[in-house]
From Swiss-Prot:
Gene that encodes the chain: lpxD
Pathway: Bacterial outer membrane biogenesis; LPS lipid A biosynthesis
GO MF terms held by the record: N-acyltransferase activity
Stated name of the protein: UDP-3-O-acylglucosamine N-acyltransferase
UniProt keyword annotations, A-Z: Acyltransferase, Lipid A biosynthesis, Lipid biosynthesis, Lipid metabolism, Repeat, Transferase
Species name: Xylella fastidiosa (strain Temecula1 / ATCC 700964)
């Protein structure tokens, strides 16, 4: 495990240090759990009361909170971002040896870089390509005509069905499925006819896709995630969607076919997005919201019913059904008074 002094961290990240610069930091932890050999941070004012009693050797915080701390501190404009950067110094991953495991299966027409790691029980299909320094974890399946660019990682049991292109430094967690058939059906004489899904999936550089998430291939055009998109666990992105660069989508969100989401958007957990609509750049959708219409103005949007006690909720549920009747009565009274 690496060790850094407080002074070394201050110099490395251009931070102002107050206190003992010789304190040696072995790791990171929360304010309540950190030991004198660990670094912590304060980014949310609601945790300010934890600051005086924290045993952390060094705390990253905003200049306004210095007086509440008792030990060494590092001053940061954005303590959360600074903590994230420092934490990466302690996130040491074991090195993977380059080469193809004897229990992997690689089609003769596929290309695997000699610097890539291909784990046990991996299957790589025809005409697929694995770039330099890629890691293809145990049990992953890469179908035909897939391309994985340099430095990308499929952690384990990831499935790329066909016609999937990953950019550089893409990271995909276990159970994710990319390139599955989109949900395309046409009704004829009381029976569904399956519409062939002839497009692919394109994932930009520096994207991350969480465990058990699914991204369907397009019907005609590709389904596209632009660069630096981050997808949480259990997210469904349907065929022909386009997700703009630097957008983040939290768990259990579902995005229906052909929806277009802009750049720098944030979608909270369990959001539903109706198909064939557009969301502009810099939009925040709070958790449990349902987006039924296009959004053309940046900002924060919400829907759904906030949590309340059951007794109040039941009363409000009954009154909600009465809203139309009450509005009509009010309009009638207004007309009579007029």
């Amino acid at each position: 495990m690496p060790i850094f002094t407080a002074q070394e961290l201050a110099e490395r990240f251009n931070l102002q240090l107050f206190g003992d610069g010789n304190i040696r930091i072995h790791g990171v932890a929360t304010l309540t759990q950190a030991s004198p050999e660990q670094l912590s941070f304060l980014a949310n004012p609601r945790y300010l009361t934890q600051l005086p009693n924290s045993r952390a050797g060094v705390i990253v915080l905003h200049a306004d909170d210095v007086k509440a701390a008792s030990g060494a501190v590092l001053i940061a404009k954005d303590p959360y971002v600074t903590f994230a950067k420092i934490a990466t110094l302690f996130d040491i991953k074991p090195a993977r040896e380059a080469g193809i495991h004897p229990l992997a299966t690689v089609d003769p027409s596929a290309h695997v870089s000699p610097t890539a790691h291909v784990g046990a029980f991996v299957s790589i299909g025809a005409r697929s390509s694995i770039g330099a320094s890629c890691i293809i974890g145990t049990g992953s399946i890469i179908g035909d005509d897939c391309t994985i660019d340099d430095g990308s990682e499929l952690i384990a049991r990831v499935t790329l069905i066909s016609r999937v292109r990953l950019g550089k430094r893409v990271r995909i967690h276990p159970g994710a499925v990319l390139g599955g058939e989109g949900f395309g059906l046409a009704m004829e004489s009381g029976h569904w006819i399956k519409i062939p899904q002839l497009g692919g999936v394109v994932i930009g550089d520096d994207c991350e896709i969480g465990a058990n998430s699914c991204i369907d291939r397009g019907a005609l055009d590709d389904t596209v995630l632009e660069e630096d998109v981050h997808i949480d666990n259990l997210v469904q992105i349907a065929h022909n969607c386009r997700i703009g660069a630097h957008t983040a989508i939290a768990g259990c969100t579902g995005i229906a076919g052909s929806a277009k989401i802009g750049r720098y958007c944030l979608l909270g957990g369990h959001v539903g997005v109706v198909g064939h609509l557009q969301i502009c750049d810099n939009v925040v959708i709070t958790g449990k919201s349902v987006v039924r219409n296009s959004i053309h103005t940046p900002g924060e949007y919400s829907s759904g019913t906030p949590l309340t006690d059951n007794r109040t909720w039941r009363k409000n549920a009954v009154r909600f059904k009465q809203l139309d009747m009450l509005v009509r009565r009010m309009m009638a009274v207004s007309k009579e008074k007029a």
